[in-house]
Amino acid sequence: GAIKDALKGAAKTVAVELLKKAQCKLEKTC
């Protein structure tokens, strides 16, 4: 349903942001 799709989209966005933060910390590019 629409709600499930919205939650999936939000979860993906959050995961991407967390990955970006983790990556910049590892590479010290923050």
From Swiss-Prot:
Keywords: Amphibian defense peptide, Antibiotic, Antimicrobial, Disulfide bond, Secreted. Has antibacterial activity against the Gram-positive bacterium S.aureus ATCC 25923 (MIC=18 uM) and the Gram-negative bacterium E.coli ATCC 25726 (MIC=18 uM). Disulfide bonds join C24-C30. It comes from Pulchrana picturata (Malaysian fire frog). Expressed by the skin glands. One of its GO terms (cellular component) is extracellular region. One of its GO terms (biological process) is defense response to bacterium. This is Brevinin-2PTa. It is found in: Secreted. Coiled coil: none annotated. Belongs to the frog skin active peptide (FSAP) family. Brevinin subfamily.
